[in-house]
Amino acid sequence: MLKLTLPIAMEQFFRILVSSVDTMMLSSYSNDAVAAVGLVSQYSFFLVVLFSVIGTGCSIVLAQYLGAEKSETELNHIAQAGTIMVFAMSVFMTLLVIFGTNWLLNRYTLDPLVRKYAWQYFVIYGGICCFFQAFSLLQGAILRSYGYTSEAMIVSIIANLTNVLGNALSLYGWFGLPVLGVPGVAAASGLSMLVSCILFRVYIKRRKDVVFHLHGITKVPRDAFRMVLKVGVPTAGESLSYNVSQITIMAMISTLGTYAISAQVYTMTILRFVFVAAISIGQATQIKAGYFVGAKQNDIVYKKVFSYQLVATTCSMVMMVVVNLIKRPVIGIFTDIPEVFSFVSTLLIYSAYIEFGRSLNLIYVGALKGAGDVRFPVLYGIFSNWTFMVLGSYILGIKFGLGLVGFWLGIGTDETTRGIVMLLRWKSRRWQKHALVK
């Protein structure tokens, strides 16, 4: 488990570190730029999750196929089916982003400069560079399903360093280059995805046991698409619901002003370091659950998942204590605006509630999906997103006047109730009848 988890954790940590550096670099350029990029990052993340749906479907099916020792032909058909679906989806989303961004931004109450920056970033990164992002995510998911998490970590580090260098050139005008601002930052992010896409392909070619050939891609059997979609479509529903609910919450937060948006962005940037362990263990749990279920070793994986969750929760809670002890200098890295500083400081205290629930949620949902039990966590997740997170945040944050604290309480209630329900689902062992390999 450690062999899988550690590279994933390092990859996640480095990715979050670079994202934080991006935020700091943008904050030195303009607070309006931070608010703009933070706003459309909800949509950018939506694209990531949408493409990850196919990657997740391929990863879960491949993990169970590998555990069941399926043939190379069957393994390759799954990867090819994912490629076809990702290509079609990326073309559609590119057109949607380019022609629909103005309509999306009109749904928000934004200062003119914030709106301009948001449009520039999303059209370039979310639209023009969409194709590279899609295939990078798919290839990464396939490589990890074979257990090559170290290679995925190396690709992530190189791609993120490319992103940082591109940002520096765009914002600071090194070597006499013009300061490109937000468009340059978006282009740098797109370039990093291109680098990632190329490197993943190189690693897949080098690993002879990773079966992913494009030859004969037009002859993929329908069953391969069905297997991927059986897992991917329900996951898409959950992902769509979660991200639309996040966008809805951001729209409500935007009515509180630019300072509130900036505080939300900075707080989430800090929290990503907190849940890096939980999300890494959750991803590794999904892979391991797939292997064990495919090999029909249900009793072993049933017990192991509880220990995985205990480690994840402990890591998250220790990190929350550490972050709150050193939060003043940490927040000072991002902002010196008193109002924003105060917002972030308060939110970090309430974030312990969110992270406790998130640590449960990430592990048990990962285990259930790896076992093939996708529909239940999806349906309950949709219910919880809109009942506890959106409605709860609206009532507490807007109606009761608690502001950002009310939103944080709503989000925490969603994460915690979902985590407890998923724990009970795992204990019931109903997931055993949902294995993809019979």
Question: What are these regions, as identified by a protein language model?
Answer:
Residues 21, 57, 95, 99-103, ...:
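Transmembrane alpha-helix boundary/anchor motif
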Residues 55, 125-144, 152-163, 185-200, ...:
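Short runs within selected transmembrane alpha-helices of multi-pass transporters and secretion channels
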Residues 3-22, 159, 192-196, 200, ...:
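Transmembrane helical elements of multi-pass membrane transporters/channels
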Residues 8, 12, 23-24, 60, ...:
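Transmembrane alpha-helix boundary and packing residues in multipass membrane permease domains
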Residues 1-24, 28-29, 45-57, 87-94, ...:
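N-terminal transmembrane alpha-helices
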Residues 13, 17-35, 105-112, 169-180, ...:
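Helix-terminus/linker motif at the lipid-water interface of multi-pass membrane proteins
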Residues 23, 34-95, 133-152, 250, ...:
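Small-residue-rich hydrophobic transmembrane alpha-helices
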Residues 1-8, 62-129, 177-233, 289-354, ...:
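Short alpha-helical transmembrane segments in multi-pass integral membrane proteins
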